UniProtKB/Swiss-Prot annotation:
Disulfide bonds: none annotated. Its EC number is 1.1.1.37. Keywords: NAD, Oxidoreductase, Tricarboxylic acid cycle. It catalyses: (S)-malate + NAD(+) = oxaloacetate + NADH + H(+). GO terms for molecular function: L-lactate dehydrogenase activity; L-malate dehydrogenase (NAD+) activity. The gene is mdh. InterPro entries: L-lactate/malate_DH, Lactate/malate_DH_C, Lactate/malate_DH_N, Lactate_DH/Glyco_Ohase_4_C, Malate_DH_type3, NAD(P)-bd_dom_sf. This is Malate dehydrogenase. Homotetramer; arranged as a dimer of dimers.
Length: 310
């Protein structure tokens, strides 16, 4: 198994290190355009192997030839968000980067599974799929795993309980229009609405929607990377080990939820072939309306981007 991580910034490097620690690949390549950065970080990771008890071969490179025959490619490359900047502000800048990266990947790997992390996430996943020519099942955006984790953590914090006992489902685009579905949110099987007031749940939902921006505002420079990287690793692990995990990911829908041809976050089964099944869960009309509205925003941005490319 060979995995390549494109982008040696905080998200990319943290993802690579966690993948190496879990020994999900025999060979792991960390690639970046800046000379020396991926080489130095990869060597540092590799040297931690004797103490961390892993044997993953970690290589840093600036040459896409070193990514040849990758089974999975994680794209984290792109410009970071700055305070006050929405994911949509990044649209045109990062689309060019993702398009270039995907083209170079496909020159050296015939049929990889691509996991996109670059923002604006749903739109960049569309860009990568469009450029790659791969079946839609093999191009997946990391969004709902992270958004659901944030919602779960806020609920656990509110109740003072273990995060492991909280389950949540956050659908839609990875942005301000995401849809945390309260009816599918539980604590040890107990509906969260039985434990927290509707008013307080609404506040936690809003905090989840702005969770990324909250961290950006704290950091001043850069954005979240520990939780995003951990979310990517959960997805990759399900693919590599064919675990068939049901995770919320940004995938191209084919009529489910009344949405067609748009990448948006919904529950899917992830296995060795990528997206193996899309689950169409029953939603209240209000949540369905929000999901469709979220998808419409993604679709409009994709069409605007396609038009700008001529």
């Amino acid at each position: 198994m060979k995995i390549t991580v494109i982008g040696a910034g905080n998200v990319g490097a943290t993802t690579a290190f966690r993948l190496a620690e879990k020994q999900l690949a025999r060979e792991l390549v960390l690639l970046d355009v800046v000379e020396g950065i991926p080489q130095g970080k990869a060597l540092d990771m590799y040297e931690s192997g004797p103490v961390g008890l892993f044997d993953t071969k970690v290589t840093g490179s600036n040459d896409y030839a070193d990514t040849a025959n990758s089974d999975i490619v994680v794209i984290t490359a792109g410009l970071p968000r700055k305070p006050g900047m929405t994911r949509e502000d990044l649209l045109s800048m990062n689309a060019g980067i993702v398009r270039e990266v995907t083209g170079r990947i496909m020159e050296h790997s015939k049929n990889p599974i691509i996991v996109v992390v670059s923002n604006p996430l749903d739109i960049m996943t569309h860009v990568a799929w469009q450029k790659s020519g791969l079946p839609k099942e093999r191009v997946i955006g990391m969004a709902g795993v992270l958004d659901s984790a944030r919602f779960r953590s806020f609920i656990a914090m509110e109740l003072g309980v273990s995060m492991q006992d909280v389950t949540a489902c956050v659908l839609g685009g990875h942005g301000d229009a995401m849809v945390p579905v309260v009816k599918y949110t539980t604590v040890a099987g107990i509906p969260v609405a039985d434990l927290i007031s509707a008013e307080r749940i609404a506040e936690l939902v809003e905090r989840t929607r702005t969770g990324g921006a909250e961290i950006v505002n704290h950091l001043k420079q850069g954005s979240a990377f520990y939780a995003p990287a951990t979310s990517v690793v959960e997805m990759v692990e399900s693919i590599v080990l064919d675990r068939k995990r049901v995770l919320t990911c940004a995938v191209s829908l084919d009529g489910q939820y009344g949405i067609d041809g748009t990448f948006v976050g919904v529950p899917v089964k992830l296995g060795k072939n990528g997206v193996e099944h899309i689950y169409e869960i029953k939603l209240d009309q209000s949540d369905l309306d929000l999901l469709q509205k979220s998808a419409k925003i993604v679709d409009e941005n994709c069409k605007m981007l396609d038009a700008s490319q001529g």
